[in-house]
Structures are given as C-alpha cells and as structure tokens.
Amino acid sequence: MKYTAFARSWFLNPDQPALEGYPSLYEGDDKLPALEASLEEIGEYQRRLWANRKQALLVVIHGPDTSGKDSLIRTLATYADPAGFHAWSFGRPNASEAAHDFLWRVTPYLPAYGQMVAFNRSHHEAVIGERVWPVRDAGTYHWPARFEAIRNFERHLVSEGTCVVKIWLNLSEDEHKQRLLKRLDKPRKRWKFDRSDIEGWKQRTRYQAFAEEALAQTHTEEAPWFIV
C-alpha cells in the first residue's frame, strides 16, 4: 500500500524503516514497549471503564485476509473482563443487511457505556470490500456520500461518549501469500481457508487501492486510523 501522511503509524518492528510520509515512533535507541505489561495496562483500564459506566470504547480492526484481526481480538479478550468486553465480526452483507442502509447492521452492536467492543471489520467494509464485491447494482452507490456518512457517524459516537479507535493491520504482498499458503499446509489452520481467500488474493491490488482511499477519507481528529 502506498501511504500518505493522514494516519498515525505504529511499527511493531523497530528495525523497519519508516514508510514514505510516516515518521516511525521508534527512532534511535527507542525500545519496543513490553507487550505483557502493555496488555495488562489495557486490561486494567478496561476494568475501570466497566466499573465507571460513563464512557464506551469501540475498537475497529481492519485489514486484508490473514492480517491477524482474529488473533488481535483474542489477545485483547484474554486481558479484558469478559463482562464488559464483546467482539463482533462483519463479513459480506447478507440479503437482509443489504436491504438497509449500510450503517444499519453495525448499530445494534455498538458498545453501551462501560463496554469495550471490538469489530472485526465494520461499517468501513462498505467503502472497501463492497467496492470490490458489490452487493447491489454498482450504479446505485455514491461513495463520497458514504465517506461523509462514516465521518458523521463516528463524530456522533465520540460526541456521545464513545471513544473510537481504528486499527489497520497492514500486510505485504509476500507475507499475505505466505499466510494463505500456511492455511493450506497446516492442518490446524486449514479450517480457516475458504475459496473467497483465493478471490481476495486475486483482487488484492484493487482492495488495497480502495482501502487507502477509505482510510484517507475517514481519518479524522475525533476518530483517527492507526496503521500497524
């Protein structure tokens, strides 16, 4: 993906050079944060959120297939109080969902005050995946209006006390290919393989282009994107 300087960038590998347009958060002698300590801190804040019941947290996790969305959510869940943590996954809209406006299907799953909710894909799929695989006549889509609707929707959530954190899990072409092959080669991962994975690989270039546009259009001060 060709990056432009619209989102905050976080590199898990301190030796990885900054991508064009992004200063790395790890420079010079900076060290990676201790993962275990960071996760325990997240868990502590999540429990405080649950006890306080005055605000909510929505974590939107996006990225191509095999980018690690499920794994990230499982890790967060391990350190969270299960009473106040929920996770939901959004794939291709079904017939009922496609018959409504695109925000309709995510609205019932938004966090209540005190809750932390993680979305594996989300309303943003309506301006990324749906551009590659439309669920209705292509001529009926108006993408600028959808971008504006998402910005307004997230600003509304923030104004009402929901913190919106959006994470894009970036994946190089080579790593994407290797992870797809692992799904076939390793028995314990084979259950995750689907024919749609092949189609997703074929459409990778288009998907990445639409993703870059979507991230640029929906990155706001209130609800920024973080690229990992």
PLM features per residue range, with description:
Residues 69:
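Conserved lysine of the Walker
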Residues 1-39:
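Charged, amphipathic alpha-helical linker segments immediately N-terminal to NTP-binding catalytic cores
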Residues 41-51:
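Pre-Walker A adenine-sensing motif
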Residues 59-61:
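Hydrophobic anchor at the beta1->P-loop junction of P-loop NTPases
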Residues 29, 129-148, 157-209:
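A glycine- and Lys/Arg-enriched "phosphate-lid" helix/loop adjacent to the NTP-binding pocket
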Residues 55-56, 86, 113-116, 161-165:
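Loop/turn-to-beta-strand initiation segments
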